[in-house]
Amino acid sequence: QSPYQIITNHPELDMSVRTLYSYLDKGILSARNIDLKRQVKFKPRKVHKTQIKDRSVFIRRMFSDFQALELDHFAEMDTVHSSQDSKRVILTFFLTREKLFLAFIMNRCTKGAVKLVFNKLEHQLGTYDFLTLFNTILTDRGSEFGDPESLENGINGIMRSSIYYCDPMRSGQKGGIEQAHTMLRMILPKKTSFEYLTQWDLRTIVDHINSTPRESLGGRTPYDVA
């Protein structure tokens, strides 16, 4: 747990987050700063993805185009890869208003697999609710996202979303989903095989992540806000 989560879940401590950090720095408490999620300085993430090669895909879908929209809320999208012994990946979404994290297992990291998830979600939610949640999506330049038109055009021919891309090597431009991945990797560390991971397993993990209080939500959880 982060210091913020500790203070939120244990009001009997009657101290601020700043005070808790101070106590940890001074060695008054047994935990060390190196044990804390936000104190650790992570190395830049290595990029293992195959990148989109067709540059025409990015016309009017650049990060600068996305910024010009000046949106209050949108969705972020990414994939999390298994260990090398499995081709399965997790397609993830982060809804920035609710801080809500969603995850779906895919058998392959392909454009077609991503489209199948989009179509399934639209079937389950209905076109109107899909449009409400995924009207604008910011993602990276992984090749699995290289056919934006197939993702933008819905099952009934109605435009269901608009896809935009981060600048190269700038994963921090979709920082919400990167933070959610940090929480996901606490449960599914790197080099974990997803070969036998089920959607039910993922639902349990996602429920845990979305039930964690957030400072940015005033101590509420994403489920409280959604």
Q: Which residues are covered by each model-predicted region?
A:
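Short conserved beta-strand segments at catalytic cores or DNA/RNA-binding microdomains
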Residues: 67, 80-102, 107
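Active-site beta-loop-alpha junctions of metal-dependent nucleic acid enzymes
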Residues: 82-86, 103-128
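Short, surface-exposed basic-aromatic patches at helix termini and helix-loop junctions that form
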Residues: 149-161
